């Protein structure tokens, strides 16, 4: 076999069209230019070989490409970090918002799976609340196109990313080549994820009201949260963006092991540019015993939320947590199809520490 044949045999596969389209959009953002709807349509048509009217691409493809473009732009933009002062961060995110067209049209997949990309500003805030340290392992159970994960990479953490949508998994593998990427039903992440994966941090924005097994169900987000919590290593921290109707007291009562709620913030209109005016909750939970009451607030003031996040208690035994969070030493990279197995029967759980939740 010739050298050229050998080289050809080991060529990297071509990136999916959504990734190449996203890269062009990211380069526009990096050049300081705004992206209009017509710009997105033109770029998508160029890279998908035709227009959406001809069936070459769909609204969901365009949304994924635009979201991935922001992720790629943020990866390359060193001036914004998790430690960036609030005034600089606010200015940056306002500028970015002005250069991105809103998602006023929702795709069938978004509606079906309740998939809304986390806005960059809220993603930055949630990741800042994690108190990340280099080399620890972070799990994101419903990673989407990577808007939360990008901040974890900037902090130097290792990533275990799970996403059930094949399109969004393509985005993740394009943007996070060093990450372990799987395709499980995140409602069963504790049962389906490799047992050797023990994250010290979980960062998540789960679907709120649609599950694979049950269809539309207002407690879907709670089951995603519980499964991720059960996989979190002792002493770890979980930061979640949940729906306003999430029953915090019920979760705390049934949580396995020690649990301390650090923050319960109702965030108003955070997803407006993503097609919904829903109020969400930013929750911070530590897997430790504590008698302290959480900070509880309802606001749409970004600076106020940052102040609360910066005042969070330090994570327990950070060095020990970094040492115990693990990935399999030589785990192969693979995409795992979503499971259709029945949900496991509820298990007997240890009653959590009693915590008073402030009324919101």
Regions found by a protein language model. Give the residues of each.
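Short, conserved SAM-binding/catalytic segment
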Residues: 170-180
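Short hydrophobic short-linear motifs embedded
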Residues: 6-8, 327, 333, 357
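Flexible, glycine-/basic-rich loop-and-beta segments that form/coincide
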Residues: 272-335
């Amino acid at each position: 076999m010739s050298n050229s044949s050998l080289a050809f045999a080991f060529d990297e596969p071509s990136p999916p069209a959504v990734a190449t389209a996203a890269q062009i959009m990211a380069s526009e953002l990096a050049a300081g230019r705004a992206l209009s709807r017509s710009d997105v349509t033109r770029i998508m048509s160029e890279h998908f070989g035709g227009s959406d009217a001809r069936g070459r691409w769909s609204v969901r493809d365009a949304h994924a490409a635009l979201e991935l473009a922001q992720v790629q732009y943020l990866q390359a933009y060193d001036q914004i970090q998790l430690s960036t002062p609030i005034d600089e961060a606010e200015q940056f995110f306002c500028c970015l918002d002005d250069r991105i067209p809103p998602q006023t049209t929702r795709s069938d997949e978004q509606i079906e799976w309740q998939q809304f990309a986390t806005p960059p500003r809220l993603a930055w805030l949630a990741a800042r609340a994690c108190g990340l340290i280099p080399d620890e392992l972070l799990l994101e159970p419903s990673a989407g196109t990577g808007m939360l994960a990008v901040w974890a990479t900037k902090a130097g953490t290792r990533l275990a990313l799970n996403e059930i949508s094949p399109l969004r998994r393509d985005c993740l593998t394009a943007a996070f080549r060093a990450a372990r990427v799987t395709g499980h039903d995140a409602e069963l992440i504790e049962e389906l994820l490799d047992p050797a994966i023990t994250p010290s941090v979980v960062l998540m924005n789960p679907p709120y009201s649609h599950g694979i097994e049950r269809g539309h169900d207002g407690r879907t987000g709670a089951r995603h949260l519980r499964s991720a919590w059960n996989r979190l290593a002792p002493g770890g921290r979980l930061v979640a963006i949940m729906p306003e109707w999430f029953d915090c007291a019920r979760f705390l009562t049934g949580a396995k092991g020690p649990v301390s709620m650090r923050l319960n913030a109702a965030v108003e209109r955070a997803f407006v540019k993503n097609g919904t005016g829903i109020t969400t909750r930013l929750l911070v939970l530590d897997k430790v015993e504590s008698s302290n009451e959480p900070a509880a607030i309802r606001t749409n003031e970004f600076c106020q939320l940052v102040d609360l996040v910066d005042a969070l208690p330090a994570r327990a035994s950070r060095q020990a947590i970094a040492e115990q969070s693990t990935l399999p030493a030589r785990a192969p990279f693979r995409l795992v199809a979503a499971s259709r197995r029945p949900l496991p029967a509820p298990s007997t759980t240890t009653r959590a520490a009693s915590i008073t939740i402030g009324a919101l």
